[in-house]
C-alpha cells in the first residue's frame, strides 16, 4: 500500500486559463465526511452546494469495492481467488476483474518491480501489522517461486481468475486504493460534482477548481523527516492525482535496519535504496500507485 500525508489547501496563486460553469454554485464550506475504511482514514470533501447525496454515493462505492478487493478480509472476492489457488477458476465481479487485469498489465510493464502475485511474500513479512517480523531465508526461498503473475489466468468470456499453483496469493494492495479513488471520482462526476477532494489514506485526487479563487489546488507533500503535517513543498494541480510512496510510515525495524513495506518480487525482501519518498502526479490514481 502507498501511504503518505497530503495537505490540500483551497487556494493557489496559479490562475486557471479558463473558467466555466464548474466554478458556479461552489462554497468554501464543504460537505464532508471522514471514515475509517480499508485500514486507513478516508475523507471526501465536496465544495458544490447541495451534494450530500453524492457524498453518500462516494462512500458507498468505497465500501463496496473494499469488501470485494481487500486481501485480508475473509470472504472478499480476492480472498476467494486465493483460497481456490491450484484448484479452480473463480468468477468475480466486473470491478474485481477489471482491477485484476490492470494489475496484470502493470506486472508485465514494471520491469519486474511489481507482481500482483506477491501475496506469499507480503503475508510472510506482514509489514504494517502488529505481528510483522523478518522471516528466515528458508521461508522466503520456499515462497518466492510462487510469486509469478504469469501463473494468473483469465477467462474474459466467463470473467474468471485462476491461480494455477497451490498456495499462490494475489495481493492487489499496491494499486487497490488508487483504483478505488478513481472509481469514487467517477461517481462524484456522475452526480454533478465539479469541485472536490478525495483522500483515501493519502491517495489524493483534486477534482475541478478550488472554490476560493477558481484556480488550482495547492497540494503539500509530507516531509519524510518531520512530524505528520509538515510539508517539504507543494504542487499546484487541478483534475490530477498526487501519490507519494515512502518508507516513513509503514516499515519494520530490525536492529539498525529499516525494512519498508515495498516488496521486491525478485528477492522476497523489501526494496533497499536511499529514497525516503517519491511523488507522482498523474491523471489516474491507479497509474500513480
What would you call each of these model-derived segments?
Residues 1-2, 9-289:
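Mature catalytic core of soluble alpha/beta enzymes
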Amino acid at each position: 500500500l502507498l501511504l503518505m500525508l497530503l495537505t490540500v489547501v483551497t487556494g493557489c496563486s496559479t490562475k486557471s486559463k479558463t473558467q466555466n460553469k464548474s466554478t458556479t454554485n461552489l462554497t468554501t464550506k464543504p460537505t464532508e465526511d471522514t471514515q475509517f475504511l480499508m485500514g486507513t482514514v478516508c475523507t471526501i470533501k465536496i465544495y458544490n452546494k447541495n451534494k450530500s447525496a453524492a457524498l453518500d454515493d462516494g462512500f458507498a462505492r468505497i465500501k463496496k469495492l473494499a469488501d470485494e478487493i481487500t486481501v485480508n478480509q475473509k470472504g472478499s472476492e480476492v480472498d476467494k481467488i486465493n483460497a481456490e489457488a491450484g484448484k479452480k477458476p473463480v468468477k468475480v465481479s466486473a470491478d474485481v476483474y477489471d482491477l485484476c487485469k490492470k494489475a496484470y498489465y502493470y506486472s508485465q510493464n514494471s520491469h519486474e518491480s511489481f507482481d500482483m502475485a506477491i501475496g506469499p511474500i507480503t503475508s510472510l513479512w506482514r509489514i504494517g501489522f502488529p505481528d510483522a517480523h523478518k522471516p528466515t531465508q528458508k521461508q522466503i526461498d520456499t515462497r518466492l517461486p510462487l510469486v509469478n503473475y504469469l501463473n494468473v489466468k483469465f477467462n474474459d468470456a466467463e470473467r474468471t481468475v485462476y491461480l494455477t499453483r497451490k498456495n499462490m496469493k494475489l495481493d492487489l494492495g499496491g494499486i487497490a486504493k488508487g483504483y478505488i479513488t478513481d472509481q469514487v471520482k467517477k461517481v462524484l462526476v456522475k452526480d454533478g460534482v465539479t469541485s472536490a477532494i478525495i483522500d483515501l489514506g493519502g491517495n489524493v485526487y483534486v477534482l475541478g477548481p478550488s472554490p476560493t479563487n477558481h484556480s488550482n489546488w495547492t497540494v503539500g507533500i509530507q516531509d519524510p523527516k518531520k512530524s505528520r503535517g509538515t510539508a517539504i513543498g507543494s504542487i499546484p494541480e487541478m483534475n490530477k492525482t498526487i501519490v507519494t510512496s515512502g518508507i516513513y510510515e509503514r516499515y519494520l525495524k530490525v536492529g539498525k535496519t529499516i525494512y519498508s513495506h515495498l516488496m521486491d518480487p525478485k528477492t522476497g525482501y523489501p526494496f533497499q535504496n536511499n529514497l525516503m519518498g517519491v511523488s507522482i502526479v498523474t491523471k489516474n490514481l491507479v497509474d500513480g500507485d
